[in-house]
Amino acid sequence: MLPDIQSTKGDGEGESLSWVGMEQIDLPIDIAGRPVSAKVNAGINLLSSPEAEKGIHMSRLYLLLDELTQGEITPALLQHVLKAFLVSHQGRSDEASIEISGDLLLSRKSLNSNHSGWKAYPLTLSAELRQSFTVTLKVGIPYSSTCPASAALSRHVAGLQFSKDFGNRIDRLPAAEIADWLVEKGMPATPHSQRSWAWVSIRLNPEAKSLPVIELIDYAEVALGTAVQTVVKRSDEQAFAVANGQNLMFCEDAARRLNNVFRCAPFCEAFDIRVEHQESLHPHNAVARIHWKGSKNVT
């Protein structure tokens, strides 16, 4: 019989360990009907006892993880695998967790030209089985943000330039001349904008039968109004410019928009939202956070 060192009594018996497991396991999985090349962390706690063992049997957990590759990931499947983790270490563990990270590729339509292109959304899916079972889904959504203050300053410059160019003729200018000026000189200053990120982490409603990852992305992109595009023709770029002009926002505005929409999302029991505007004006980022614990307390 081969020796089983893991099952022998360890040093400092009686000392429990809060988590023991494996990280960065490669698994091909299916999330929302899409293939994801994932990195998986999986582990359990190790309880203290008079006969405490050196460690866990990691190969048992590794083999059980293969069940995640046999179909679309659902809350029920995650709970089943976590329960199997505990059964595989009967009496030695009462907590188990799985964390799945990867990029979800979605085909997104252009704003105007009816083309489609692919966009990657980084996500992390965390499932824990302790006294209760919880699933947390975190997704990163890229979008564009245009500074309201910069837009106001740009409009002010345009007004000054208009007055300078036309002087006392302002009250009797032909519409055609004004239109020509706007086309040629109507933007003497431009507001600054930047690629931005919304990191939305939600705790799923316990009744959830599937992972609402696409719904989460759609909710966020509609609320923000300026989702980063894939394929872009000139008409799409113009539509994108209009969208940015109609959705001027500081990071605080973006956080509040997301708060309003996810407070009403049927699949969301609680959330933690972080928005990051990667400033083009500054060498630092502008960041806002908002948390909701399923009550009226928001911080």
Curated annotation (Swiss-Prot):
Pathway: Cofactor biosynthesis; 7,8-dihydroneopterin triphosphate biosynthesis; 7,8-dihydroneopterin triphosphate from GTP: step 1/1. The keyword Hydrolase applies. It comes from Citrobacter koseri (strain ATCC BAA-895 / CDC 4225-83 / SGSC4696). Belongs to the GTP cyclohydrolase IV family. It catalyses: GTP + H2O = 7,8-dihydroneopterin 3'-triphosphate + formate + H(+). This is GTP cyclohydrolase FolE2. Converts GTP to 7,8-dihydroneopterin triphosphate. GO terms for molecular function: GTP cyclohydrolase I activity. The keyword ATP-binding does not apply. The record marks 147 as: May be catalytically important. Its EC number is 3.5.4.16. NCBIfam families: PRK13674.1-1. GO terms for biological process: tetrahydrofolate biosynthetic process. Keywords: Hydrolase.
